[in-house]
Amino acid sequence: MQESVCRQIVTVKMKQGLHLRPISEIVRMTRDYACDFKISNGDRSANAREVYDLLELQALPETELVLEAVGDDATKLMEEIVQFFESGYKKFEEVSDLSD
């Protein structure tokens, strides 16, 4: 069986950028799939299963990121992660707004 390879560009829509809460959710999502997943910001690349790696991307609002998944579940994981970014992960933004 040939491994699937998926690549997609997304924009960070979270008001506070890609911070610890949404990063933790990305890491959680990747654990459910049999594939390698990385996220790149310019010349910085991160293993999406590692919180610290993702924090080092320093992805501010409106940053374009390149997502790449390789493996049997690459297509399924890519769909879930792209949906996560397209929604701006409202769940965390709404919680943040309560403290303002």
Indicate residue ranges for each PLM-predicted region.
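Intrinsically disordered, low-complexity non-transmembrane regions of multi-pass membrane transporters
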Residues: 1, 98-100
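Acidic-glycine-rich active-site phosphate/pyrophosphate-binding loop
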Residues: 1-3, 31-32
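Short amphipathic
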Residues: 3-14
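Preference for bulky hydrophobic residues occupying beta-strand positions
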Residues: 10-12, 39, 67
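Short strand-loop junctions, especially beta-strand C-caps/beta-turns
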Residues: 13-15, 42, 70
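Amphipathic alpha-helical interaction surfaces in cytosolic regulatory modules
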Residues: 16-38, 44-63, 75-80
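Intrinsically disordered, low-complexity regions enriched in small/polar residues
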Residues: 35, 39, 54, 86-87, ...
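C-terminal structural segments of small proteins and small subunits
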Residues: 61-98
